[in-house]
A protein has these predicted regions:
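Metal-dependent phosphohydrolase cores
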Residues: 1-145
Length: 145
């Protein structure tokens, strides 16, 4: 679980500050993602660990942190809501598109950030990530479930 305790955390927080302070992004706190973890906390964890990996590999850690923070911005309870009951079977396939659509309404995104959000469910979906940064978030997301 992400906890703030050093300079690397300060840099990470500055990269995603405009995202985490947004009221719509904050709404992810209302939805459970995995077990007792909120969607917000899950995205924050994926963003932090992906950021660390990308930074160590000399990749675009800013795009990684930002894309990962928004990768599950679908804003519904996929287990219990009426909408989710109809879509539960398809949630894994459709939520990346919903998250990208929601993100684009709020923020300017780079091509890498868009790819990270849209393709993070590979290999469940057939949308193959285009960038190494997208693979980092994809695998960190799987590890964080």
């Amino acid at each position: 679980m992400y906890t703030r305790n050093n300079n690397i955390c300060e840099e990470f927080e500055n990269i995603i500050k405009d995202l985490t302070s947004n009221p719509t992004v904050q709404k992810m706190n209302q939805f459970k993602q995995h077990y007792n973890t909120s969607c917000y906390d899950h995205c924050l964890n994926v963003a932090f660990y992906s950021y660390i990996i990308a930074k160590k590999l000399g990749l675009n850690y800013k795009a990684v942190a930002r894309g990962a923070m928004l990768h599950d911005l679908f804003l519904y309870d996929w287990r219990n809501s009426k909408k989710a009951l109809k879509l539960r079977k398809f949630h894994a396939f459709i939520h990346p598109e919903i998250a990208l659509e929601n993100s684009l309404k709020l923020f300017y995104l780079t091509e890498k950030e868009k790819d990270i959000i849209l393709k993070h469910m590979w290999p469940v979906t057939i949308k193959l990530p285009k960038y190494p940064e997208s693979y980092i978030v994809t695998f960190t997301d799987k590890y964080s479930t």
